[in-house]
Amino acid sequence: MTNPPQAGSSRRTALKRIAATAAAAATAPLIGTVDPARAADAAAQQIGAAAWETLIDGNSFASRAALESEWNYLYPWGSDHNGTARMYASSTDNNHCYLSPAGVLNLKATRITWNEGNSSKDPYLPIHYHSAAVHAKNQVLVSDRYPNWEIRGEFQAPSARGTWPAFWITGANSWPPESDILEYKGDNRNWFNTYDGAWENTLVAVSSPGSWHEYRIWMTKTSGTDVQIHYYLDGAWKGAHTGSNFVGKTMNIIINLQMEGASGSSGPAGDTYYKARNVYVGRTNNG
């Protein structure tokens, strides 16, 4: 894993280290014909003298106060989405969104036994679960000023049929864009997805999704309209997608535990847990 610049580190060295990750990934299929070190130098020069800044430092789940300073409860648009879980969480309702131990966010889905109607969002499925979601107060915007972004976190994700955890970014004012950093849909395959009007998918079988794994993207501006997104699992590069027309589009960062829907019906009768820690967001700032 490439670490972000730390206090007291050389800005040039730190930026070169970050850039090397994307450069090495971009040249991975060409190893033997392209010098990765030279490619890393070129990528570092493209980043240039930009300053690296941290938006979420990895400690936002250390306490309830820290959580609420960096995250909002529910989806950006409310409690419902495209599955059968309705999100319930607030500063006074911690049944489905809580910290235990300190530093670990727990989202819990519980099956309900009463009729709560249907989701207000397409495809309007009947509500079978209460669960939780959070979205970051900081938003993602790729631009000339902010051309490079790193988003990562460690997760213990459920993967049983009917469970649908996600860690993703999506358009705040329009859809697309979307990038799914973590998404399990009822089995042990993580879906690294990019949506820009058409879907690009990289599916990776994960050994024990319920154990801690790190999921990460490096997103960089490649033109006046497009980005390239590199996807990583546990520090290993898994693929690169093009996000057309991502530039200039404000995006929300979301962690949620949805249920059923695309992950299959007849979900778990018992409680389902999705855990997160060390979530980090940083970017270059050209001033």
Tell where the protein language model's regions lie, with residue ranges.
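Aromatic sugar-binding interfaces of carbohydrate-active proteins
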Residues: 70-73, 225-275, 284
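Short, aromatic/His-centered strand-loop micro-motif at the edge of beta-sheets
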Residues: 195-212
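N-terminal secretory signal peptides
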Residues: 1-13, 20-38
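Glycan-recognition/cleft segments
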Residues: 167-192
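Beta-strand acidic-aromatic groove motif in beta-rich domains, primarily in extracellular
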Residues: 161-169, 226-227
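Low-complexity, Ser/Thr/Pro/Gly-rich disordered linker/stalk regions
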Residues: 17, 41-149, 181-186, 257, ...
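Short tryptophan-centered beta-strand motifs in secreted/extracellular beta-sheet-rich domains
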Residues: 61, 212-221, 229-231
